[in-house]
Regions:
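Alpha/beta-hydrolase fold nucleophile elbow
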Residues: 157-169
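Short amphipathic alpha-helix adjacent to the substrate-entry channel of hydrolases
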Residues: 96-114
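C-terminal catalytic histidine-bearing segment of alpha/beta-hydrolase fold enzymes
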Residues: 125-127, 262-264, 275-327
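Alpha/beta-hydrolase active-site loop
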Residues: 132-154
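N-terminal cap/lid segment of alpha/beta-hydrolase-fold proteins
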Residues: 32-76
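Hydrolase active-site cap/lid region
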Residues: 33-34, 39-43, 180-237
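Short beta-strand/loop motif that positions the catalytic acidic residue
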Residues: 257, 263-265, 269
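Short beta-strand element of the alpha/beta-hydrolase
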Residues: 77-87
Length: 327
């Protein structure tokens, strides 16, 4: 009886500790979570700009984009587009997630936009689902969206002559992929890219967490889903899959012609493997590509715990606008 009561007390203490830890963590996230947004909050009204919502672009799933236009169109900045690409592990999120960021940069005089794109299913996947939500498809959709933005802006009397891509997490990857693959063929030429916490490569063995979230059981299926190419176990064993993985991995898209890159990563990120940023940095360095890396020493994937570093990143993004946009 004594032993049973003792075990119950120990169990209750453990339970209370866990509950206290979780509550404390949630309070801390709530306390800190609003701080990053305060850095980019603007008082938005028609003296700052206007938003054109749910505009069409050519894609197979009727995705839309939103366009943010500054009030003053008689400035060099108003000829520059900043395209924000939402994150969400490639399987969630929406263009509305980026509203505050778009309004912030529009308040600085830039045209901004945010886009919805095809997402990967979180459920059990058929072969068709594996093949039809790849990073290649997402890139093609964004390419189509930029063409639509160029046309829509022209109808509004705006001649967009250059752009930057940006994003957080999965959006950061797509921003880099777009900038490195499409800088010259984009309807609006890309001058630079800036991103936070974007995965830089997709070697399947590095991605046990994402495979678990997406209910992917084999490396071959993971590679298939990311690339849109039917990857077999035999291709995995022979390394024949590697060129396809490289084609959707920012690190391996970098060359001497790549655009300047601003990036930030948390050192205790439990979602994106922290080691993946180093080959990206090496690739930029080896190819002589201008870059800045802002390190968030106390931050996980949400980048909540280094407000000073986030402010540094935002300031640098505006410096990139001044330096790399031709005004």
């Amino acid at each position: 009886m004594f032993s049973t009561n003792k075990n119950r007390k120990i169990g209750m203490l453990i339970f209370l500790f866990v509950v206290s830890f979780i509550v404390g963590m949630l309070i801390n996230i709530q306390r800190l979570g609003s701080l990053p947004m305060k850095l980019i909050q603007v008082e938005w009204n028609d003296t700052v700009g206007c938003v054109y919502e749910n505009l069409d672009y050519e894609n197979p799933s009727d995705h839309k984009y939103d366009l943010y236009v500054p009030k003053n169109l008689d400035t060099p900045e108003s000829k520059c587009l900043i395209l924000y690409i939402h994150g969400g592990s490639f399987n969630s999120g929406s263009k509305e997630d980026d509203d505050a960021w778009c309004k912030y940069y529009t308040s600085k005089g830039y045209v901004t936009a945010t886009v919805d794109y095809t997402l990967q299913s979180k459920k059990g996947k058929s072969e068709e689902e594996l093949l039809n939500a790849s990073l290649e498809l997402m890139n093609e959709e964004i390419l189509s969206c930029v063409a639509a933005i160029k046309e829509q802006a022209s109808q509004l009397g705006i001649d967009l002559t250059q752009m930057a891509t940006c994003g957080v997490s999965a959006g950061g990857t797509l921003a880099m992929n777009y900038a490195y693959k499409n800088a010259d063929i984009s309807a609006i030429p890309v001058k630079f890219v800036f991103q936070l916490a974007g995965p830089a490569s997709f070697e399947p063995s590095d991605w046990s967490l994402l495979k678990s979230i997406d209910h992917i059981t084999t490396d071959a299926d993971f590679a298939t889903m990311m690339t849109g190419v039917r990857i077999t176990d035999e291709m995995m064993a022979s390394k024949e899959y590697l060129p396809y993985i490289y084609s959707v991995s920012p690190t391996y898209l970098v060359d001497a012609n790549s655009v300047p890159t601003l990036m930030g990563y948390g050192l205790i990120d439990h979602c994106v493997p922290t080691q993946l940023k180093y080959p990206l940095i090496d690739a930029l360095k080896e190819n002589g590509v201008p870059y800045d890396y802002v390190e968030f020493p106390k931050s996980n994937h949400g980048m909540y715990n280094d407000i000073d570093k986030l402010q540094e990143f935002i300031n640098l993004s505006l410096e990139y606008c001044d330096k790399y946009f031709d005004k």
